[in-house]
């Protein structure tokens, strides 16, 4: 009986090792330049955030465009999105990532990782942006061209109240940041 269990366990392991994981098929898109993106936050800790696109010319909504274009899920809690120079920057809070996507094809062109819990991104130039985070007394400095963190600004007196994190440059004890 014991050897039968071992054989069954070994068989299950072998079968699982041979499985091919299907993440879905990638679709091709060519969106107009006048559409509207909708971040669907999803349920906290369920990894079911999605991105939708509304085309005002055809009056249609395309749901789950990130998944359909990239054959992978967006992640856990899509917090916000900013568009700069035909690149959409989708901030996914609980997945600790900011995805850069082409706004016409919805394909991922890059990502910024290793963030604590990002909420919003604000661009200063093509090579510098600030990222606010919840539960972190720092504003991260990132290089959008290289998709990397280049530094951070400590804000030691900043409280963990979410309204402070929701507005870049609105903290009354600190002057505007000029770097």
Task: For the regions a language model picked out, list residue spans one by one.
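Sec-dependent bacterial lipoprotein signal peptides
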Residues: 1-16
